[in-house]
């Protein structure tokens, strides 16, 4: 019988156990006080930016999310990168031709903060179809960190999600499901300019409520009912329950519109494919080569 090597490697990242000392109430209260210090200006499109418009932010944010997903970055990288981008735009006018450069630079710095193996400048330049050079990205990195005054450890909604789940009397597998759905909502919120005005703790709490509602977990667990969970989380982050409900409803509305846009995009793509196939079958190849 021939000897065979058995590969036992797995792609699961080994993580340290959660430190209970970092999840106590004292730490949470400190985080709630600190989150305001790293918040961007709500009105920077009107007061600071001359060329950058909200829809441009949406385009570059969607591109950044796709890059982070394709590179399998940590969940915290994208929201942190968007925090850098919004804070930079809050007090530094930028030409629209340099917005993608700023987005790539924000991912570059955020991955250094959250990844064990950060994204390289060369790789990010490839994702821009080489429209920027590595030396341009490194120069923008210096400008970014100086404008942010090297205050790079900003609070994101991800920092609060684990605190909320720790306080909830649920089985670990249920927490894991809620965690994954809430993280998806957080990423979605980071792409939409309407959520700039909401503090990270509010977005995190709204995402958890939206995740529980979407999974219909309140049907089997009284604690997870809409009223109980909203009241509980509003007390944890010390906010008005109505404000939390409004944020959660805004998140669900954003999800619906995103799904609707995705479906329309799929339909238009299928229609385009059918039209291309019909065009190919009806038009002789030699006709395409005629230079009119």
From Swiss-Prot:
Post-translational modification: Phosphorylation at Thr-283 by MAP kinases is required for ubiquitination and degradation by the DCX(AMBRA1) complex.
Alphabetically ordered keywords of this record: Cell cycle, Cell division, Cyclin, Cytoplasm, Nucleus, Phosphoprotein, Transcription, Transcription regulation, Ubl conjugation
PROSITE patterns tied to this protein: CYCLINS (PS00292)
Any single GO CC term annotated in Swiss-Prot or TrEMBL for this entry: nucleus
Alphabetized InterPro entries for the sequence: Cyclin, Cyclin-like_dom, Cyclin-like_sf, Cyclin_C-dom, Cyclin_N, Cyclins_cyclin-box
Location within or outside the cell: Nucleus; Cytoplasm
Domain of life of the organism encoding this protein: Eukaryota
A GO term, aspect molecular function: cyclin-dependent protein serine/threonine kinase regulator activity
Modified residues (Phosphothreonine): 283
GO biological process terms on file: cell division; DNA damage response; G1/S transition of mitotic cell cycle; mitotic G1 DNA damage checkpoint signaling; negative regulation of transcription by RNA polymerase II; positive regulation of G1/S transition of mitotic cell cycle; positive regulation of G2/M transition of mitotic cell cycle; response to UV-A
Keyword hit for Cell cycle: yes
Metal-binding as UniProt keyword: no
Subunit: Interacts with the CDK4 and CDK6 protein kinases to form a serine/threonine kinase holoenzyme complex. The cyclin subunit imparts substrate specificity to the complex.
Similarity annotation: Belongs to the cyclin family. Cyclin D subfamily.
Role according to the record: Regulatory component of the cyclin D1-CDK4 (DC) complex that phosphorylates and inhibits members of the retinoblastoma (RB) protein family including RB1 and regulates the cell-cycle during G(1)/S transition. Phosphorylation of RB1 allows dissociation of the transcription factor E2F from the RB/E2F complex and the subsequent transcription of E2F target genes which are responsible for the progression through the G(1) phase. Hypophosphorylates RB1 in early G(1) phase. Cyclin D-CDK4 complexes are major integrators of various mitogenenic and antimitogenic signals.
Protein name as catalogued: G1/S-specific cyclin-D1
Native source organism of the sequence: Gallus gallus
Highest classification ranks of the organism: Eukaryota, Metazoa, Chordata, Craniata, Vertebrata
